[in-house]
Curated annotation (Swiss-Prot):
Name this polypeptide is given: Receptor protein kinase WSS1
Topological domains annotated Extracellular: 28-477
UniProt keyword Glycoprotein, yes or no: yes
SUPFAM superfamilies linked: L domain-like, Protein kinase-like (PK-like)
Residues holding ATP: L586, G587, R588, G589, G590, F591, G592, V593, V594, K607
Alphabetized PROSITE patterns for the sequence: PROTEIN_KINASE_ATP, PROTEIN_KINASE_DOM, PROTEIN_KINASE_ST
Similarity section: Belongs to the protein kinase superfamily. Ser/Thr protein kinase family.
Length: 912
């Protein structure tokens, strides 16, 4: 024992020696790489053993010998780069620009600390297959004027989430515009000029709100870059835009709020009216609009040094000023179609009649006919057509028009023919005068008949619905009158019946009693929510039928609730919860108590809403909640199975979650008896919650906002998979008759700043709360903890303060977590996401779909148990086209606050 005790003090010394030996070995590896480079590039003139003393080589402080910077810029060096260069794993800057280096660029995948990479102006012949892999700290990448073979921007660039500048002009980049760049939300400077890019700008580029300089000009491919340039409207920090010499189409978007100084779009195919949001930019110093197909008034810019907009456009006048009323009207019509290029080629000048614009026929200098059939038009029909008082014939058939036929077109005094056949118009056909022949078949109108108005037209689809004379109208009129009378009588009978029932049921519902009169059983029924909505609930569920179902023990709970037309009386709920016994209480919330119930051998959760808090709006709020919840079906949202109303009573039946709440697993371990969650389990739960909220925000038929997202509203099943609950007081994002315009809902600590101060509700309110939950999952702390010192009570504040120091932050992490090196790396990524989600300004927070994509890569990497390959097949198999497109729209997303926070690995502003 004594001998062993004497040996113990030697252990730390031995470990120290081993660490020192490892450091020496790594330093030796760096030295070997530098010597290899000296041999490959003799002109460097490096000689000796002290590589840290070589010109252009910088080593870390302390004499460990690790090379941190290699600056060989503009030295006219020739030679090749050795493969051993990849062993410089501590390198933060590799600057090789302005030389004549040849051969292949070696793999750089091990340089996880590399922040600056400059390859410009060399003669490299190829890039490594793993180019940009592993460069998670990269901030500046410049590789202009390289004679490489054609290559696409690799998807691995998405890992460079801190990338500030990507400059690769004249670098042989080919293929469609790389949509992966939309994930680089820290990107401020993007220069891809003089390459071979094709296709349009992905809509996802609108997420690049930090962009200051965008240069895509002079693509050399035959097709060039094309399509609209709408994405630049969201780039509010943009100062320089060069997209000249491409094939972009459509109008200039609204540029209000931007900071543009240089705007060069010459030599494209842009159309439309130059917007006042561009001409009124006080920051603008240089503008070039030449050789497009701009229309309307000539723009009047303030005095700026560089201005070029005259040549090659179709402005109505040679000097700034308004166009003629007729020209203005037709340009408004073109605006509805998105200013199509085929029209813009001839719709120029200030006189549509001389020479006549394509599709325009004039009589006495006024438009009498418009024929734009088969012009591949999309967009909407403009109400401005009503200003053409001499218009007799309007043919917009066989296009792709959407929206409705404007009612105002019925006021056209000279109109005789309206042909909108074979489009995608919706709504109803307005009621035109009998003299108007309307051709509207082949659309998506609510009625099977595609026409209205017109008398005696030869086309079988253009007949008047009310102008036919003779005996046919009288039987139809009699039939209609009979139906109306019958409906009135029916409603009168229903009203009397309801009044009679209300008088019989004046006594308040007593949930503690299992004895219910037949009349009460009829009124106090649970209505069943199936996959297609709420059942009509016209009659109570017979007790004998319920008993029959109870006997069928093989049926599961979903079959019990989703059988067609199935309804359960309130007796079932009373029995299931033992008269709402205290022993069955699962939890209490601001709007009521949740009980555990047993239906047909299956557990459910019955929420009994507090009648005192529902107030006079209780019925409206309750029905709105049902209307919302019946439309929401998702794997990670707690499903509503049914509901019951009587007087002030509100009862909701949900699926039962046996794993408790996330709060119990994070902050109430002693009371709940749960063991701490592992990091893998926490990541999986975080992804589940994100997917549920993502569905509410953008994949459901309507956009829903939770407004009270917190750990106690996140329920877990037996496998610790999460579902979001208690979104019954959700406020529909778009106002409807059943939107809940109530007080601010939510829990202090999880409220976004703008919501707490102004009550303004957007989806970013939920994103903020989600970020707070991520912080709780990382730290194991409550969002507000009065037991801590005053400067540490608010989790968000202390979290954002500690995240700036990686070592300090490590002590801030939940001590119950056992993290490997890989686990620590993933935790830092989640912490970074939490920081962005809780940004003060809503526009700085990511959308939930981007949170899903960022977490998905981490969860897939860890491959936690109980995640099947087809885990989400159930929610997508019935997903409509709208939801699928919205789902596919979302790419990986990170965001950078422009104020204070940098990345974990390298400074935000690199000084090199």
């Amino acid at each position: 024992m004594g001998r062993d005790a004497r040996r113990l003090p030697l252990l730390p010394f031995l470990l120290l020696l081993l660490a020192a030996a490892a450091g020496v070995a790594e330093s030796a590896t760096d030295a070997e790489a530098i010597h290899d480079l000296a041999r490959s590039v003799p002109a460097l003139g490096w000689d000796g053993d002290n590589v840290c003393g070589f010109e252009g080589v910088t080593c870390e402080r302390g004499g460990a010998g690790k090379v941190t910077e290699l600056n060989l810029a503009d030295r006219g060096l020739s030679g090749t780069l050795p493969d051993s260069l990849s062993s410089l794993t501590s390198l933060t800057a590799l600057q090789l620009q302005g030389n004549a280096l040849t051969g292949a660029v070696p793999s750089l995948a091990r340089m996880g600390s590399l922040a600056r990479l400059a390859l410009d102006g060399n003669a490299f012949t190829s890039l490594p297959p793993d180019f940009l892999h592993g460069l998670t700290s990269l901030q500046y990448l410049t590789m202009e004027n390289l004679p490489l073979p054609p290559w696409p921007v690799p998807d691995a660039i998405a890992n460079c989430s801190s990338l500030d500048t990507f400059s690769a002009s004249n670098a042989s980049i080919s293929g469609p515009f790389p949509a992966v760049l939309a994930t680089l939300v820290s990107l401020r400077n993007l220069r891809l000029s003089y390459n071979n890019l094709t296709g349009g700008l992905p809509p996802e580029l609108s997420s690049l709100i930090a962009m200051e300089s965008l240069q895509l000009n002079n693509q050399r491919s035959d097709d060039k870059l094309s399509g609209p340039i709408d994405v630049i409207a969201s780039m509010k920090s943009l100062k320089l835009l060069w997209i000249q010499s491409n094939k972009f189409t459509g109008p200039i978007p609204d540029l209000n709020g931007t900071q543009l100084e240089a705007f060069n779009v010459r030599d494209n195919m842009l159309t439309g009216v130059v917007p006042p949001s561009l001409t009124g930019l006080m920051s603008l110093k240089n503008v070039s609009l030449s050789n497009n197909n701009f229309q309307g008034p000539k723009p009047a810019f303030a005095a700026i040094p560089g201005q070029d907009e005259d040549s090659g456009n179709g402005f109505c006048l040679n000097t700034p000023g308004p166009c003629s009323p007729l020209t203005t009207t037709l340009l408004q019509v073109a605006e509805g179609f998105g200013y199509p290029y085929e029209l813009a080629k001839t719709w120029k000048g200030n006189d549509p009649c001389s020479p006549a614009w394509v599709g325009i026929v004039c009589t006495s200098s006024d438009v009498s006919m418009i024929n734009l059939s088969r012009k591949n038009l999309s967009g909407r029909i403009s109400p401005a057509l009503a200003n053409l008082t001499r218009l007799a014939r309007l043919d917009l058939s066989n296009n792709n028009l959407t929206g409705v036929i404007p009612d105002v077109l019925t006021t056209l005094p000279s109109l005789t023919v309206l042909n909108v056949a074979n489009n995608r118009l919706t709504g109803e056909v307005p009621k035109f005068k009998p003299s108007v022949n309307v051709l509207a078949q082949g659309n998506l109108f609510g009625q099977s008949s595609g026409s209205s108005g017109g008398g005696g037209g030869s086309d079988g689809d253009s007949s008047s619905s009310d102008s036919a004379g003779g005996g046919k109208s009288k039987p139809n009129t009699g039939m209609i009158i009979g139906i109306i009378v019958a409906v009135i009588i029916l409603f009168a009978c229903i009203a009397l019946l309801v009044h009679h029932r209300k008088k019989k049921n004046v006594e308040k519902f007593r949930p503690v009693s299992t004895k219910t009169s037949p009349a009460e059983s009829e009124m106090m029924k649970i209505q069943v929510v199936g996959a297609n909505g709420i059942s009509n609930g016209s009659s109570a569920f017979p007790t004998e039928l319920y008993s029959h179902v109870s006997a069928a023990n093989s049926s599961n709970i979903s079959e019990l609730f989703e059988s067609h037309g199935m309804q359960l009386s309130v007796e079932v709920l009373l029995k299931a919860t033992n008269n709402f016994s205290e022993d069955c209480i699962l939890g209490r919330g601001g709007f009521g108590v949740v009980f555990k119930g047993n239906l047909n051998g299956k557990l459910v959760a019955v929420k009994r809403c507090d009648s005192g808090t529902m107030g006079t709006k209780g019925q409206e709020e309750f029905l709105a909640e049902i209307d919302v919840l019946r439309k929401v079906r998702h794997r990670h949202l707690v499903a509503l199975l049914g509901y019951c109303t009587h007087g002030n009573e509100r009862l909701l039946v949900y699926e039962y979650m046996s794993g408790g709440t996330l709060r119990e697993h994070l902050c109430d371990l002693q009371q709940s008896g749960f063991i701490p969650l592992t990091w893998t389990q926490r990541m999986t739960i975080a992804l589940d919650v994100a997917r549920g909220i993502e569905y509410l925000h953008g994949l459901a038929q309507e956009t829903f906002i939770h407004r009270d997202l917190k750990p106690s509203n996140i329920l877990l099943d037996q496998d610790l998979r999460a579902k979001v609950s208690d979104f019954g007081l959700v406020k529909l994002a778009k106002d409807t008759d059943k939107s809940l315009m109530t007080r601010i809902a939510g829990t202090f600590g999880y409220l976004a700043p703008e919501y707490a101060t102004t009550g303004k509700v957007t989806t970013k309110v939920d994103v903020y709360a989600y970020g707070v939950i991520l912080m709780e999952m990382i730290t194991g702390r409550k969002v507000l903890d009065d037991s801590l010192p005053d400067d540490e009570t608010h989790l968000v504040t202390i979290f954002r303060r500690n995240i700036l120091d990686k070592e300090k932050f490590r002590k801030f992490v939940d001590p119950t977590l056992e993290l490997s090196a890989e686990g620590w790396t993933s935790l830092l990524e989640v912490a970074d996401l939490a920081r962005h989600c809780t940004a003060r300004e809503p526009y700085q927070r990511p959308d939930m779909c981007h949170c899903v994509n960022r977490l998905s890569s981490l969860v897939d990497q860890w491959k936690p148990t109980n995640i099947d390959e087809d885990d989400y097949e159930g929610e997508t198999s019935e997903m409509g086209l709208h939801q699928q497109l919205e789902k596919w729209r979302c790419d990986d997303f990170t965001i950078s606050d422009s104020d204070t926070f940098g990345s974990f690995n390298v400074p935000r502003k690199y000084n090199g």
